[in-house]
Structure formats: C-alpha cells, structure tokens
Amino acid sequence: MRHYEIVFMVHPDQSEQVPGMIERYTTILKQDGGQVHRLEDWGRRQLAYPIEKLHKAHYVLINAEATAEAVDELENAFRFNDVILRNMVMRTKTAVTEPSPMMKEEPRRERRDDSAPRQERAEKKTETTEDNA
C-alpha cells in the first residue's frame, strides 16, 4: 500500500454535509486494510481566485495509506459529486501524522497603533500640535 495526501474543497452552501462525506471517503480508503493517518477539517476559507463564482470553500485534508484501487474509487467519487469544487490526490513517501501548518496555532499580531486606546492617541496628537504652534 502507498501513502497519499488528499485535499478536497466543498461548495460552501453544503458545509453541513462535510462530516458525512468525510465518513464515506475514509470508509473507501480503509477498504482492504487501508489506514487514515491524519484527518483535518480546515473549515470555510477564502479562495485565492473565484471558482464557479464562489469566493469561499470548505477544505478537508486526509493523509492515508491505501490501495491504488481504493484511491481510484475515491477519485471517481470526487468526479461525480457536484458538491466537490476541486480535489487533489498526491502520493507521498511516508505517512504524515503531525498537524499541518493550517492547523497550527498562529499568534495574533496586533498593529502598533491598536495597543493604545483611541482616546489616548487623540490626546497625544492634540498635545503635539499644540507644542508645534
């Protein structure tokens, strides 16, 4: 069996169907002793460019070990499902189990101006204009 990384994008209006789709697709991959190593639901995200006049899509990532027949069946299921906007199946050398960069926590960066309340900034601005006059 080979290792695969699978990403698919679902129409945003059909986001409530995603858990059922994930269950159906993981069942296909687990046929003949396949195994899912990583499953991440990235949720609705902004698209880099519009697809079918849509600007958002629901993303799902699966890393699995499966047979070629199971992957062919999965690709066939993607092809005939109108809710799937795009999909990508890549073969990888090893199983990937650590969280993807999309799922890792990012510290929120604050703008430098936002650290001071607006009123204090306004007071400082009036003080500097008075000093210059």
From Swiss-Prot:
It comes from the Bacteria. Transmembrane segments: none annotated. GO terms for cellular component: cytosolic small ribosomal subunit. Keywords: Ribonucleoprotein, Ribosomal protein, RNA-binding, rRNA-binding. GO terms for biological process: translation. Residues 93-133 are annotated as: Disordered. The keyword RNA-binding applies. SUPFAM superfamilies: Ribosomal protein S6. InterPro entries: Ribosomal_bS6, Ribosomal_bS6_sf, Ribosomal_S6_plastid/chlpt, Transl_elong_EF1B/ribsomal_bS6. One of its GO terms (molecular function) is structural constituent of ribosome. Residues 103-133 have a biased composition (Basic and acidic residues). Binds together with bS18 to 16S ribosomal RNA. Belongs to the bacterial ribosomal protein bS6 family. This is Small ribosomal subunit protein bS6.
